[in-house]
Each structure stands twice: as structure tokens, then as C-alpha cells.
UniProtKB/Swiss-Prot annotation:
It catalyses: (2R,3S)-3-isopropylmalate = (2S)-2-isopropylmalate. Belongs to the aconitase/IPM isomerase family. LeuC type 1 subfamily. Its EC number is 4.2.1.33. This is 3-isopropylmalate dehydratase large subunit. InterPro entries: 3-IsopropMal_deHydase_lsu (IPR004430), Acnase/IPM_dHydase_lsu_aba_1/3 (IPR015931), Acoase/IPM_deHydtase_lsu_aba (IPR001030), Aconitase_4Fe-4S_BS (IPR018136), Aconitase_4Fe-4S_dom (IPR036008), IPM_dehydratase_rel_enz (IPR050067), IPMI_cat (IPR033941). Pfam families: Aconitase (PF00330). Heterodimer of LeuC and LeuD. It comes from the Bacteria.
Length: 485
């Protein structure tokens, strides 16, 4: 029977359906299930030790056809970097020894074990969580893992996707399975509609601030409701991408016509009768009426406004219309202490209007907001305007293909004319593992997903924002929304 477990007939959630369909072996009570993994994504940072483990044990990669690697974390993205040929963006050499070694090691491991890789210069190279959906590899009802915290991005398609550790990467490479204890489930129902000028990034930052960075607490979260249904696939990916930032195991959105339209015709999407059969199955994945979640949260989209973070974790945020909070206003002693430390690091004074906070750098990119729709949103704001004096604006497409599509639409010219840097694909300034970093004391408005101390460079100060707020901030030179222009 479609939509219920054969054993009990109990209504099931989206997460439970996908989980149940992938259980290879159910162990004794209290022991983890063994799940089959449909897609395993790799990058250069968390895979070297896993391949070493295979080599030492004399094992092979069990399903190379379900495994894909790309180079993203350590890759330089700028024309000025000697690593690039400015004509094609090919990797020639990387100055940093560790970064160079990790990329060279990934290439050698993929060649030795027969794993497909998308290296720099490849038309399908890019951030791992951008190229998966882009290629049509990410599909509803799949289980997807990667040695990366933001694997939940793929849940926007109705897949069960989550990050794993290096030892688990080795286990999946060797067996195409993974022992997992079944997490609790949570529903986040977003009622109403987002107002004009308010984005998916504002929504997820608001949710994280309201619930705290532990609000998801290991749950598989299903995002639902009118506001979620009206989001594009790119917006849904932004939501699911940041699930880990409030403690969730994974984030999922049930597939619908928006999902099918996005996936149709992509390189790895099915064709003809196979496509029709797949869509028929995907339509059964929606949560059954009467299914129960362990926890439920309701959020009113109409009350959300442009949002930013002021502290050193994604849960320390506020509406842009507000002011820097006073730690003394926090009733909880732990939160009060965390706020004091965060403001000291960020160099902010309580009571300062956020719109009076100047920035040095604006970064548009990452697996959170580096897709074509994100670049379009930023371009719409900055079109015909100029980046403020003293501000550096970096536009980093999430993939080579996104870059080409943006150039075909003339977005690169809009950014360049405004005084921004138009760069190659990569994780870039999201994290300080490549040449794109902040200097100590520099302040950035960033469309990435983490604002931890030193995340974008030692001593760097990060405010998480949407692409629209990022572009407006670049023009004003201070934190700003498009309505301020």
C-alpha cells in the first residue's frame, strides 16, 4: 500500500517514507538500522583519510556509479591569483601547500579508485551542494551523504541528505551503506506569505534566531506550509542548507510540481516512461494525513523582515530595522555571557542601529546563496549603482555552469560595472581555507551560512545576510536593505 508501512498501516511522514525505503537491515532494538545510500558526494577536505583506509584494507569503492567528487573548498577563485589562467580558469598551481596537496590527493585517489571527478576547469565543477542538484543527480526520495555539514541542502528536493564524518565516508565508499539510528522528526510549518523584499535567507535566519542553534536537536526537519510551497527550488535549497545551523540532522521539503519542473531535462534526470514512473513515485512521498511528528513549530512568514546576524553564531540575529542588543537584556546567564563575548569579538556597541554598522567586504556566494537566482537577486539591486568607496564586493558563482549562465544573461557586466569582482566558482570566502579571506578586524556582509569567530579569516567579523541585503550593503557601505536605496 502506497504511503503506509506494510506492517502497521500507520500514516508516515516524508522522512519516515524515505528512511523505510532504504533500510537494508533492521537491527535489534536500540541498534542502528543499515541504510542504503543512493548518492555519495566527495570533496578534497574530508576524503583523503577515507581513501587511505580503503587502500590499507585492500578494498575498492563498491559503487563508483553512485559516487561523485569535485574540488571546491580549497580552490582559488580570483583572476589575480597565479593559480589561474585568465582565459579558461584552469588550475595551474596553488601556492598554499596544504590546499595544493588536498586537491592533488583527491585527483590521485579518484584516478586510482575509478571515481568520477569534476576538477577545476571542468564545465560541471563547482561547490558540491550546487552541482548535485544542477546536474540532476539530486532527486526526490534518495538518500544522499557527503563529508560536509551542509549536505542537507539536497533535502530541498525531497531527499534525505545529511553530512557524515570521515570514518563514515570510508564506510560508504566500501559498502554503499551506512549504520544510522532513526532520528526524531519535526515539522516547521510556515504560514502566510513572505513580503516583497524578504527572502528565504531571511526566513531561515529568523527561524534559527527564534529557536536557537540547538532548536533542531538532531531531528529530521520537514519544512512545509504556504510560504515554503511558494519558494523556488533555489530558495528551498537555502532553507534546507542551513538546517544544521540550528542543530537539525537534515532538512526536507516534499517534492511537488516546482521540484519536477526544476529537475526535468537535467543531465541525470530520467527520460520518457522512466520519468513518468519516477514522478508517480515521487508524488507518493508527501507526508500522509494524520502522520505524527515528534515536534511541531509554526512560523508566520508575513511577520518576517530583512534579517542579519550580529554575533558569532547563526542564532544571534535580528531584524535589520533593529539595534545591536544589550547583553543585559538576556535573562539567561549563559546567553548573556555569549552575547557579551560575541559583541566584544564583533566590535559592536549595544544600542547602535544596525544600519549604522559599516562593512569592509561584501561576499555573494557559497552553497547557501551562490546559485543563479541568488546572483540575479543581487544584480537586480545593484544594477546601475556603484559599490561604495572603501568596500570590496566579491561575486563568486557556486559552479562553473552558474557562472556561464550568469554571463549569458549579462549579470557579470552589471557587477563589474558596479565595481564588484566577478570570480570563478568555489566555496571562496565562506570559509578560510583558500585565498579569499578577511583580514583581522575586517567586517563582512556575507551570504554564507556561518559566522563563527575566524570562519572567514582570523579576526574577521561576519554578518550573515541575504543576496538582496548584501547588494544594498555594498552600495551604502553600511548594513542596508534594498528599500534604503
Amino acid at each position: 500500500m502506497v504511503g503506509v508501512t506494510p506492517q502497521s498501516g500507520k500514516p508516515r511522514t516524508l522522512a519516515e517514507k524515505v528512511w523505510d525505503d532504504h533500510v537494508v537491515r533492521t537491527a535489534a532494538e536500540g541498534e542502528p538500522d543499515l541504510l542504503f545510500i543512493d548518492l555519495h558526494l566527495l570533496h578534497e577536505v574530508t576524503s583523503p583519510q577515507a581513501f587511505d583506509g580503503l587502500r590499507m584494507a585492500g578494498r575498492r569503492v563498491r559503487r563508483t556509479d553512485l559516487t561523485l567528487a569535485t574540488e571546491d573548498h580549497n580552490t582559488p577563485t580570483g583572476y589575480a591569483d597565479p593559480s589561474f589562467n585568465t582565459r579558461r580558469g584552469e588550475l595551474l598551481t596553488i601556492a598554499d601547500t596544504v590546499s595544493r596537496t588536498q586537491i592533488e590527493t583527491l585527483r590521485k585517489n579518484c584516478a586510482e579508485f575509478g571515481v568520477e571527478i569534476r576538477p577545476l576547469g571542468d564545465v560541471n565543477q563547482g561547490i558540491v551542494h550546487v552541482i548535485g542538484p544542477q546536474l540532476g543527480l539530486t532527486q526526490p526520495g534518495m538518500t544522499i551523504v557527503c563529508g560536509d555539514s551542509h549536505t542537507a541542502t539536497h533535502g530541498a528536493s525531497g531527499a534525505l541528505a545529511f553530512g557524515i564524518g570521515t570514518s563514515e565516508v570510508e564506510h560508504v565508499l566500501a559498502t554503499q551503506t551506512l549504520p544510522q539510528s532513526k532520528p526524531k522528526t519535526m515539522a516547521v510549518t510556515v504560514v502566510g506569505e513572505l513580503r516583497p523584499g524578504v527572502s528565504a535567507k531571511d526566513l531561515i535566519l529568523t527561524l534559527i534566531t527564534q529557536t536557537g542553534t540547538g532548536g533542531g536537536n538532531g531531528h529530521i526537519v520537514e519544512y512545509r506550509g504556504e510560504a515554503i510551497r511558494k519558494l523556488s527550488m533555489e530558495g528551498r535549497m537555502t532553507i534546507c542548507n542551513m538546517s544544521i545551523e540550528w542543530g537539525a540532522k537534515a532538512g526536507m521539503i516534499a517534492p511537488d510540481e516546482t521540484t519536477f519542473d526544476y529537475l526535468s531535462g537535467r543531465k541525470h534526470a530520467r527520460r520518457g516512461a522512466d520519468w513518468d514512473a519516477a514522478v508517480a513515485y515521487w508524488k507518493t512521498l508527501a507526508t500522509d494525513e494524520g502522520a505524527e511528528y515528534d515536534t511541531e513549530i509554526i512560523l508566520d512568514a508575513s511577520k518576517i523582515s530583512p534579517f542579519i546576524t550580529w554575533g558569532t553564531n547563526p542564532g544571534q540575529g535580528a531584524a535589520l530595522d533593529g539595534v545591536v542588543p544589550d547583553p543585559q537584556d538576556f535573562l539567561d546567564e549563559v546567553e548573556r555571557g555569549a552575547a557579551e563575548r560575541a559583541l566584544a569579538y564583533m566590535g559592536l556597541t549595544p544600542g547602535t542601529p544596525f544600519r549604522d554598522v559599516p562593512v569592509d567586504v561584501v561576499f555573494v556566494g557559497s552553497c547557501t546563496n551562490g546559485r543563479l537566482e541568488d546572483l540575479r537577486a543581487a544584480a537586480d539591486v545593484i544594477r546601475g549603482r556603484k559599490v561604495a568607496d572603501g568596500v570590496r564586493m566579491m561575486i563568486v558563482p557556486g559552479s562553473y555552469q552558474v557562472r556561464e549562465q550568469a554571463e549569458a544573461e549579462g549579470l557579470d557586466k552589471i557587477f563589474i560595472d558596479a565595481g564588484a569582482e566577478w570570480r570563478f566558482a568555489g566555496c571562496s570566502m565562506c570559509l578560510g581555507m583558500n585565498p579569499d579571506t578577511l583580514s583581522p578586524g575586517q567586517r563582512a556582509a556575507s551570504t554564507s551560512n556561518r559566522n563563527f569567530e575566524g570562519r572567514q579569516g582570523k579576526g574577521g567579523r561576519t554578518h550573515l545576510v541575504s543576496p538582496q541585503v548584501a547588494a544594498a550593503t555594498a552600495v551604502v557601505g553600511k548594513l542596508a536593505a534594498p528599500a534604503d536605496l
